[in-house]
């Protein structure tokens, strides 16, 4: 065999993407016998995970040449773990960038070219001996970022690109007796890097499993399962295409067992030839869906011509149909709604080299929060994800490893020229198709995958259209998705997207559905009022950067109102930040720029509904509610249940009716509801009678039985109803007060308390209760919040900056004191605010003999001022007052546009737990619809704030300005006080996007007349 030499210059050749790489195939496992299969131990596979010898170089010029030679001693090198990113193992720097390519600003490159100054090279070496009895030896690299060259015993074996699908090679011709030397060189940047410009941390290295494997004499190289329902979804048809490694005679024993261990098929097929097809009918088939992920267990036992078992293949099979019915996508005949999330393969400790246990943990979180769909943004994931999605029940959009927005999205404008990748450029055509083939061939047998995606934000053009056509031809059972089809309807003259009719678009057929990202609800409605030839999904929406996801219910409500709108995928699942320890040994989450990486996009990777360690954020409370499959509308006499599931009867759950009086549970009953999927029904009940008070009826559906992702009793849906029973208020005797008027202060004293107002400083300066001073600093009016990421993205802090100054700087222009005998005393301050035009706020304190201080804040609208981020007051208490108890919406924080998932009740928490560890400190901890709010020390001493009208409140260890000044949580000092905030209401958090979309107008606290009344009292 003629020896090949690797030509390093081909790294910059976009037509060179695979050399001697084996064809892609299905990801099935195979075992030598039944015992192996039961123990999941493959004797025909040998893992190469573990320590490899390793050498790092900054660029091609400084790499070690000749290291692959058999006599080059690499055993004196350092070692590195595999699988892992080299940057997570201390070699080079992690870099986070969104659109810009990593070399932008360092080297000026045309498309396909690679950097010369900074192109980290990772050289790996592993020594091994061939297991006894292995005649053929192959090696599989499940994921290498971004390109790799392979040698065995000094001989060049092959080359491969595509960081996210397997690269496999035949090592047999290069083997020697005894010890063999496997050498791999991994290049961070190759021409393929132009196709892999995803919005994520830029790593390199061998980051997925590596293993050797052999094949038996007779072997299934590939199988393609087609399992579809028929006869009006009552029965099933099974057809399986087999590709064999030779044409020898063989036998195939097929056994199919359902999820109750009933044998459905048990037969033997005699085969000759390199291909074969197995077909069978299945009566009374149990269909697969996200609601009922019914899987049949197949075992394919392969025997040679002498009837010896040579391999056994286990395979899960799900019967399901996903198709376009007219202009509606349907699963098993029912209109599907995607309650989805985008999932980057990322963990703060491992990067994209995620252990399998972490994958299962992610799916648990999703199921617990009613998520039914995953988009693998923007590359094929570890095969384990799809295996588990089949079992858990998720609808998956499997996305090709391609994103090129750095080649054409330039500072907010669109560029279409020779550097736009891939567009119609013929030299990218085969590389683009190769990525599609590698994904489809590996993943095709997973029932959970219902859509193939052509990548993300890679412009339009013929190359991507041809990819979509490949998907359709190779697998007609699935639909094809591509969001950037919009760039195939660009008006060439203006350079702007126009919503042209289909016959005016270049490649309208690329995507089977209209897919857009971050489109506002009103825009979706407008689009669908004109263009109804395809269903509409949001492949990315409700951008979850920091404190976000406001207004999400507008989108989920639209799925009920507009049949063509079939849901969306939240951006995204987990914050992307990297864990380290600081100089003091504290845990730190680092984002872009923290490693000295430039260019970078700083904290723009913090878009998760879970944090970087995959702990839940408070945003999940809203996601769970908006994604629930059942709408429960309770009343005083019964509950209406709208069953929005596709296949599930409510009788699968217990219906729990609970009654609370003034926040305390007083009654509960378990019922059963029998309402079919897609139907609406009512369940009656009779509530017990209690006295006057505010009542909350909570209706919940909870699991009757435990699942793999939740315990029995887990709540899947709830609804609440609030009503009030009036009664005669008890007249309480008013204790007398004493007013002390001095030269500089006004004192008000009563039984067990005292209040002091400064005539000099013009503010409330003291409130003592039971001899304890509760006010550490003067109460301050507050019109500001620590800007959230969405605020910064839309420029809200700049637009409303006057209100920050108004919160910090005021001037009292009038003070009035009045008494109502010995029953109450009133002190009224009029403050001029640091705004232009000048605004005034009147703060009135009324003290009564029971120790209550009533506060009234009044503002008269001043024309010319912007909207007001918040309207309330801050109280600073000692730091040991860190225990919170409140009657309002909880348990997680909520905002006027993100409170659908909050429950009205009494909750307890702490000031530290109310801090949400977003990558950048920002506003958090707010609670809406509060009746009363208590902050105490551990002995129960403190203050209660209440109001006759529901208000908003929070208690944190920091004030808004301290939060705003910090870029990381370690910038915040150890807490020295507790800041309690009472508010008439603040801005909603927004979330349509995080780079320009403001909070929806209805959730903005506008510049208008305002009145806020509340009272506080020591406890």
Regions found by a protein language model. Name each.
Residues 152, 235-270, 639-643, 647-671, ...:
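Beta-strand-rich binding/interaction modules
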Residues 3-18, 22, 30, 38-39, ...:
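Accessory beta-strand-rich segments of carbohydrate-active enzymes
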Residues 196-220, 576, 584-634, 639, ...:
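Catalytic cores of secreted or luminal carbohydrate-active enzymes
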Residues 176-179, 243-323, 691-732:
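Extended acidic/polar, glycine-enriched regions
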Residues 2-40, 99, 309-640, 644-651, ...:
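Extended substrate-binding grooves/exosites of carbohydrate-active enzymes
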Residues 88, 93, 98-114, 161-163, ...:
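An acidic-aromatic loop/edge-strand motif
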Residues 88, 95-97, 188, 289, ...:
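Beta-strand/loop-rich accessory regions of lumenal/periplasmic or secreted enzymes
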Residues 124-126, 165-169, 274-280, 681-685, ...:
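Short strand-edge motifs at loop-to-beta-strand transitions and within beta-strands
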């Amino acid at each position: 065999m003629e020896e090949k030499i690797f030509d390093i210059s081909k790294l910059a050749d976009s037509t060179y993407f695979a050399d001697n790489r084996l064809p892609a195939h299905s990801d099935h496992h195979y075992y030598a016998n039944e015992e192996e299969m039961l123990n999941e131990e493959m004797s025909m596979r040998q893992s190469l995970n573990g320590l490899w010898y390793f050498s790092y170089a900054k660029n091609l010029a400084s790499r070690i040449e000749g290291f692959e030679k058999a006599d080059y001693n690499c055993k004196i090198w350092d070692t590195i773990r595999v699988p892992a990113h080299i940057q997570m193992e201390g070699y080079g720097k992690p870099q986070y960038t969104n659109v810009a390519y990593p070399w932008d600003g360092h080297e000026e490159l045309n498309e396909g070219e690679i950097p010369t100054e900074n192109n980290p090279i990772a050289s790996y070496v592993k020594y091994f001996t061939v297991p006894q009895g292995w005649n053929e030896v192959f090696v599989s690299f499940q994921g290498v970022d971004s390109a790799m060259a392979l040698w065995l015993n000094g001989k060049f074996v092959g080359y491969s690109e595509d960081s996210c699908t397997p690269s496999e090679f035949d090592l047999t011709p290069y083997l020697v007796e005894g010890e063999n030397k496997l050498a791999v060189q991994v290049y961070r940047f190759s021409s393929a890097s132009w196709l892999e410009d995803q919005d994520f941390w830029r790593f390199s290295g061998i980051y997925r499993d590596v293993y050797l494997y052999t094949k038996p004499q007779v072997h299934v190289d590939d199988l393609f399962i087609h399992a579809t329902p028929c006869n009006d979804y009552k029965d099933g048809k099974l057809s399986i295409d087999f590709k064999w490694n030779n044409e020898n005679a063989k036998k195939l024993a097929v056994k199919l067992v359902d999820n109750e261990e009933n044998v459905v098929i048990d037969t033997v097929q005699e085969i000759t030839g390199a291909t074969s097809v197995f077909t069978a009918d299945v009566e009374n088939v149990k269909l697969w869906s996200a609601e009922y992920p019914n899987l049949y267990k197949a075992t394919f036992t392969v025997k040679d011509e002498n009837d010896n078992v040579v391999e056994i293949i286990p395979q899960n099979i799900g019967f399901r149909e996903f198709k376009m019915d007219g202009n509606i996508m349907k699963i098993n005949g029912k209109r599907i709604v995607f309650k989805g999330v985008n999932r980057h393969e990322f963990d703060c400790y491992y990067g994209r080299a995620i252990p399998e246990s972490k994958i299962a943990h992610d799916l648990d979180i999703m199921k617990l929060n009613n998520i039914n769909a995953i988009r693998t943004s923007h590359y094929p994931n570890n095969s384990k994800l799809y295996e588990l999605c089949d079992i858990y029940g998720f609808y998956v959009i499997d996305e090709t490893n391609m994103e090129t927005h750095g080649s054409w999205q330039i500072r907010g404008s669109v560029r279409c020229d020779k550097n736009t990748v891939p567009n119609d450029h013929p030299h990218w055509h085969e590389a683009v198709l190769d990525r599609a083939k590698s994904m489809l061939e590996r993943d095709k047998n997973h029932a959970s995958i219902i859509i193939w995606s052509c990548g993300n934000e890679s412009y339009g053009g013929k190359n991507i259209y041809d990819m979509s056509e490949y998907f359709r031809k190779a697998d007609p059972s699935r639909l094809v998705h591509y969001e950037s089809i919009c760039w195939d309807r660009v008006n060439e003259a203006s350079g702007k997207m126009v919503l042209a009719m289909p016959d005016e678009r270049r490649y309208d057929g690329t995507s089977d559905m209209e897919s857009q990202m971050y489109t506002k609800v009103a825009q979706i409605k407008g689009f669908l009022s004109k263009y109804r030839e395809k269903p509409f999904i949001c492949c990315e929406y409700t951008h979850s950067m920091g404190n976000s996801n406001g207004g999400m219910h507008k989108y989920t409500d639209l799925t009920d109102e507009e049949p063509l709108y079939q849901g969306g995928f939240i951006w995204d699942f987990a914050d992307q930040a990297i864990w380290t320890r600081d100089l003091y040994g504290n845990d730190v989450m680092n984002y872009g720029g923290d490693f000295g990486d430039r260019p970078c996009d700083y904290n723009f990777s913090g878009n998760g509904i879970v944090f970087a360690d995959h702990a839940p954020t408070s945003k999940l409370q809203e996601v769970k509610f908006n994604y629930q499959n059942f709408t429960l509308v309770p009343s005083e006499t019964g509950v209406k249940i709208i069953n929005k599931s596709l296949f599930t009867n409510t009788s699968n759950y217990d219906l729990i009716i609970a009654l609370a009086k003034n926040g305390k549970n007083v009654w509960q009953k378990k019922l059963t509801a029998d309402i079919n999927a897609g139907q609406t029904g009512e369940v009656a009940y009779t509530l017990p009678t209690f006295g006057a008070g505010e009542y909350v009826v909570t209706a919940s559906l909870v699991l009757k039985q435990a699942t793999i992702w939740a315990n029995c009793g887990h709540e899947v849906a709830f609804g609440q109803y609030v009503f009030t029973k009036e009664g005669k208020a008890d007249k309480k005797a008013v204790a007398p007060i004493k007013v002390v008027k001095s030269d500089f202060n006004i004192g008000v004293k009563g039984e067990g308390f005292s209040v002091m107002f400064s005539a000099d400083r013009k503010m409330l300066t003291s409130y003592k209760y039971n001899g304890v001073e509760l006010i550490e600093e003067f109460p301050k009016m507050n019109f500001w919040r620590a800007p959230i990421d969405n605020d910064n993205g839309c420029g809200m802090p700049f637009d409303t900056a006057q209100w920050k100054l108004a919160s910090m700087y005021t001037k009292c222009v009038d003070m009035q004191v009045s008494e109502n005998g010995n029953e109450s005393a009133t002190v009224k301050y009029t403050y001029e605010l640091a705004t232009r035009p000048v605004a005034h706020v009147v703060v009135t304190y009324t003290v009564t003999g029971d120790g209550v201080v009533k506060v009234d804040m009044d503002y008269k609208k001043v024309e010319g001022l912007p909207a007001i981020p918040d309207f309330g007051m801050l109280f600073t208490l000692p730091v040991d007052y860190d225990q919170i108890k409140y009657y309002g919406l909880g348990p997680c924080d909520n905002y006027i546009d993100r409170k659908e998932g909050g429950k009205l009740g009494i909750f307890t928490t702490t000031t530290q737990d109310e801090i949400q560890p977003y990558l950048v400190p920002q506003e958090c901890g707010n609670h809406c619809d509060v009746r009363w709010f208590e902050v105490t020390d551990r002995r129960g001493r403190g203050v209660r704030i209440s109001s006759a009208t529901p208000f908003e409140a929070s208690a944190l260890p920091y004030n808004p300005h301290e939060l705003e000044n910090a870029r990381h949580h370690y910038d915040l000092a150890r807490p020295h006080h507790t800041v309690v905030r009472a508010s008439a209401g603040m801005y909603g958090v927004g979330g349509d996007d995080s780079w320009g979309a403001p909070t929806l107008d209805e959730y903005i606290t506008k510049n208008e007349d305002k009145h806020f009344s509340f009272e506080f009292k020591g406890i």
